[in-house]
Amino acid sequence: MADEAETLDAAHGATDAAHGAADAAHASSPGMPQLDFATFPNQIFWLVLTLLAIYFVLTKIALPRISSVIAERQGTLTNDLAAAEDLKRQAAEAEESYNTALANARAEASRIAQETRDEIQAQTQVEIDKADAQIAARTAEGEARIAEIEAGAIATAEEVARDVATEIVRAFGPGQDVDAAAVADAVANRVRG
């Protein structure tokens, strides 16, 4: 065991010596290591290698995925726009068919209203014609009665006038013979005008 302890002490001593040398190297280097011109070729190599690795990762992995997502979104947008245009066209067609149906319904309602008015007018005209015929019949009947009454009145008046004229002639000329035909002609001429 003693040998092991000596070996460990020797290893610690070597490690301490290495740390001391590293500390001495750090103490002797001026400022930041990125700005040390002695390490520029090594830094440029790793910079180019890193940029190439980033370029490879971007061009082979990231950009194709981004491009596919953009293409998918563009396709979705295009499909949505096409669907929106189709819906807009369908809405315009529906509105046009609605307006056409509304215009047809209005025309049909107007036609039905006109037919109803015409039918009512025809029925009214039939009733008016019927009433006119009844009025004309009653008027003709009334005129016939009036003519009959007038004829009866004239006949009665003529008869009364003949009787009165005969009596007047007898009163003025007692014992004279009365000419009934002459009295009747005189009364008829006077009554008829």
UniProtKB/Swiss-Prot annotation:
Gene Ontology molecular function: any one: proton-transporting ATP synthase activity, rotational mechanism
Domain of life: Bacteria
Residue spans crossing the bilayer: 44-64
Location of the protein in the cell: Cell inner membrane
Stored InterPro entries: ATP_synth_b/b'su_bac/chlpt, ATP_synthase_B_chain
Task performed by this protein: F(1)F(0) ATP synthase produces ATP from ADP in the presence of a proton or sodium gradient. F-type ATPases consist of two structural domains, F(1) containing the extramembraneous catalytic core and F(0) containing the membrane proton channel, linked together by a central stalk and a peripheral stalk. During catalysis, ATP synthesis in the catalytic domain of F(1) is coupled via a rotary mechanism of the central stalk subunits to proton translocation.
Name of the protein this chain belongs to: ATP synthase subunit b 2
